[in-house]
Amino acid sequence: MHLPHAAGLMPTALALALVVTTSVAAFPTSASAAEGQLPAAVAPARSVAAADDEKSVYEARFTGLAMGTIVSAKLYAADEKTAAGLANRFEEKVAAYETLFTVRGDGPLNDVNKNAGVWRMVDCRIASLVAQAKVVARDSDRAFEPTIGPLVNVWKIGFGGHSRPSDADIKAALRKVDYTKIAVDETPGACRIRIDPGQSIDLGAIAKGWIGTALASDMKEAGATSGIIDLGGNVSLIGSSPAGVDWRIGVQRPDAERNTVMAVVEASGVSVITSGDYERKFESGGRTYGHILSPVTGEPATTDLGSVTIIDADGARADGWCTALFAAGSEKALALAQREKLAVILASSDLKTLWVSRSIAPKVTVLDKSMKIQVVP
């Protein structure tokens, strides 16, 4: 895939803008949902600039469209050549990971789904992520389900769906949703996956978290001393900011316009990921239907949570558990977060309460003074 770009050199101040984590999760989750949703090529804008002449820190910036969302990065290095290399490397890796996890064309996941019932060889990174998704499904009592694909295809929320499917269609899809039917063989160099006929694997609620962590690791190996990667609201951080302090990440208010912040979390070297149903939904018959589906009822999850934010070094873990906790509701989510030792910020659906894990409470500033703050274990 050719990725046209624009590059230039310009002076810039070392000012750290607030980056907002949101619930948008537009990674195509099924072949039918993805069809026609993305342009054939990503058209990123890149630049390299001296971020701080006195300290000889250079900033590489990247912005483009990939995985159905806006991808951006600010990457810092000690010299201009390394910074320029970071911009190129980031572009290459984004394209590679999109190809790895695509559900379109002859992508490996699409091959597994099209050949349900037989073993299919896959990249071992895919096998590892599917195995991790199965663990989250098991430990969350199926509040997260990597075989949700048939339900996603029926509802198409965020992919053109604007009405409730028939009961018959929902029941038929539900019969195909069962993570225990996924078989994963992680033999090094010979990884493979098998699913039952009619099933399809959907990594839309975990893949971007994995990709964010992978990109951060790749950029560190390529010479980045610091950086911030934003995959449509899923934020992954490389170390601390160039100024040597934590990054400041805003948590979006669920009932407001994009970039309206209700809290700020200070963090370094982790992923900050948010789930909610406020950005992908439709209204029909006087009801609002969100995109996070229940594998038990087949309907959009009924929850008393407005959003869930998780801070974790493992982006895939944060991404998968965000979806699980949101669908589980506040009471079960708080119990699961404590058991799994997850650092969370949970907002109630009425936005009257914000639950914050004790481990991160000193790093969280609540901007909405109307919300009651509860620090939890």
Question: What are the roles of these predicted feature ranges?
Answer:
Residues 2-377:
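Mature catalytic core of soluble alpha/beta enzymes
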